[in-house]
Every structure is written in C-alpha cells, then in structure tokens.
Regions:
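A glycine-rich helix N-cap at a beta->alpha junction
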Residues: 71-87
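A short, aliphatic-rich alpha-helical micro-motif
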Residues: 123-125, 182, 212
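Hydrophobic beta-strand scaffold residues
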Residues: 54, 79, 160-161, 218
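Conserved beta-alpha-beta core of the PfkB/ribokinase-like small-molecule kinase fold
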Residues: 129-209, 225-227
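Conserved phosphate-binding/catalytic region of the ribokinase-like
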Residues: 1-5, 28, 151-155, 200-312
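Glycine-rich phosphate/adenosyl-contacting loop at the front of the ribokinase-like
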Residues: 1-57, 66-69, 74, 92, ...
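Conserved phosphate-binding/catalytic loop of the ribokinase/pfkB sugar-kinase fold
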Residues: 94-139
Length: 312
C-alpha cells in the first residue's frame, strides 16, 4: 500500500471534562489535560496506528513545536513540521460535558500561517493518497498551499480527499467557494451538519447524493448513527456504529477519516471501509483526547477513573 500524505493542522488541546453546566462568573470543577491535537494531525496519527505509511505537513509554533514533533513521531507519523519562530502553536480549549459533547474555543496560531513556502514536491514521492483538512484552507496562505498540493497531486494521478472541518469557518468561507476550490478532490468526508450545509439538503441521503455528484464519492459521518457513502449520485453503502460508552467526542471524525482512508487504500469494499471508519471513530470517543495511545501524552491532571466520575 502506498503512503498517505495529510496536510492539516497541529493544535495543543486543553481538554476540560466537567460533570454539570459551566457556571458563569465562578468556578466549575473539571478534569483538565493537555494533549496534542489538530484535525490533520489526529487523522495522520490514527492512520499510522492503523498501519499506513503516513506523513503530515503542518506548521507549529515556537512554544510547543518540538513537543508536537515528538508526539507525532511517537504515533508513527513522519512529521514535516515547520516551527514558526514568531508565533505560538494553535490552541483549542475543548469543554466536554458528561455526554461527551464538546464546545471549543480556538486560536489558530502558527497553523493559520502555513503556506506554499512549507511545500516541496518530494512530499508526494511514494504517496498513494492526499488528504486535506479544510482548516488549512480557511486562511489565504493555506488556501494557496492547498491549490498547489492538489494541482501537483492531480498531475501525478494521486487521488485527493478533503474533510470540510467545521460549519462555522466553512460558512464564513462560503460553501460555493469551498466546492469550487476543492473540485480536484474525488472524495469528501463531512459530518452530517457539514454535509447538509454544503449540499443545501434536508437529510443525509440527499446531501450524500448531491455531494457525490460533485466529487464522485461522498462519505457522510453520522456519529452514533454510523455513516453512509454515495457515488456519482447514488447511495451505495452504509455502516452502523458499534456501541460504545462515550467519554470525549473530540477527534472522532478525524479518526473515522483515517479508518476509512486506510481501508480504502488497502482495497476494501465501500462497506468494509465505512465499517473500519466507524470502528476508529468509536475507539476515539471511548477515551479522552483525539489521538490513539493517550498514555503517551503529557497530562496536567490524572484521568484515572474519569468515566466512573462522569457517570457517578
């Protein structure tokens, strides 16, 4: 199986798990941990865990850049990270409630300044698939990088997939503009809200059909409802999500993308690839943090017994 190149972001995740609603103007008890994250880096880490030869192109800051490089290498990823000497790494504060749902406060930091200067054509040597996190595209330097990478991948007949990232920045960027800029991609992997927004549709099936008519293949992530896949305007596969006790939903979609892409690159059927994606996504939500092997990460507070405390 040829390699996977992911272009995306690395983020320092501050994950705060709290049992009840956050109290305004006073303290709310929480278990807080510091972990490596970022949509692109998460997908790359899960893909490496699943056996793919994976490299990541990203930009990190002067403060935690070397830590991010080390964490990616621990995960089996070949990191191609430029350390920005003037900017800190991106930071996300993820507030996770007792159901596993999260709300996020975001500072893009160095990740918002990745650009064509970070690119070299040899990044595509030995690569069988290019995957883009759309977070990279929402700032002009990253958009120029995405255009360049997709153009060079297309010239080498390397298939391209894109994850639309998040409804907020996607809406600000413009859905028609996004569809136009990502036209070289043959696979799009949105969650349900992103799919409905991009397709201007009312249900998952309609959105998948519409998006697959544009890209060729659309994979719509449905969370606990599993996933479905459409090709050329027709639903061709579905998969159910395995049951799991949800601890933290951060990174579930990134893990799904990794499972789906690695299985697809290995020649799996659409049904098998969806199932592998769902399995990876469920593995992600059963733990704290967005990457595999949480025991390898630096913790600010212990999380032993966390599930017991959350569901007490």
């Amino acid at each position: 199986m040829s390699g996977l190149l992911v272009i995306g972001d690395v983020v320092t995740d501050v994950v705060a798990l709290h049992d009840g609603p956050a109290a305004t103007g006073t303290d709310t008890p929480a278990d807080i941990s510091l972990r490596p994250g970022g949509s692109g880096a998460n997908t790359a880490s899960w893909a490496a865990r699943l056996g793919a030869d994976t490299r990541l192109l990203a930009r990190a800051g002067y403060d935690t850049g070397e830590w991010h490089v080390a964490q990616l290498a621990k995960a089996g990823v070949r990191p191609h990270l430029r350390i920005d000497p003037e900017r800190p790494s991106a930071v996300v504060i993820a507030m996770v409630d007792s159901t596993g749902e999260r709300s996020m406060l975001t500072n893009r930091g160095a990740s918002g300044h990745i650009g064509v200067g970070d690119w070299t054509p040899d990044l595509l040597d030995g690569v069988g698939h290019l995957h883009l996190s759309a977070y990279t595209m929402f700032a002009e330097p990253g958009l120029e990088l995405a255009r360049l990478a997709m153009r060079e991948a297309a010239e080498r007949a390397i298939p391209i997939s894109v994850d639309p990232a998040s409804c907020g920045p996607l809406r600000a960027f413009g859905t028609e503009r996004f569809l136009r800029e990502t036209a070289p991609a043959s696979v799009v992997i949105p969650n349900l809200d992103e799919a409905l927004l991009l397709a201007d549709a009312a249900d998952p099936e309609a959105s998948a059909r519409t998006l697959s008519a544009h890209y060729g293949t659309a994979v719509v992530k449905l969370g606990a409802g599993g996933a479905l896949l459409a090709r050329d305007g027709r639903i061709v596969a579905r998969a159910a999500a395995p049951p799991v006790d949800v601890v933290d939903s951060t990174g579930a979609g990134d893990a799904f993308a990794a499972g789906f892409l690695v299985a697809s690159m290995a020649g799996s059927t659409p049904e098998e690839a969806l199932r592998k994606g769902c399995e990876a996504g469920m593995a992600a939500v059963a733990q704290v943090g967005a990457r595999p092997d949480p025991g390898n990460f630096t913790l600010l507070t212990p999380i032993a017994g966390l599930r017991r405390k959350l569901h007490h």
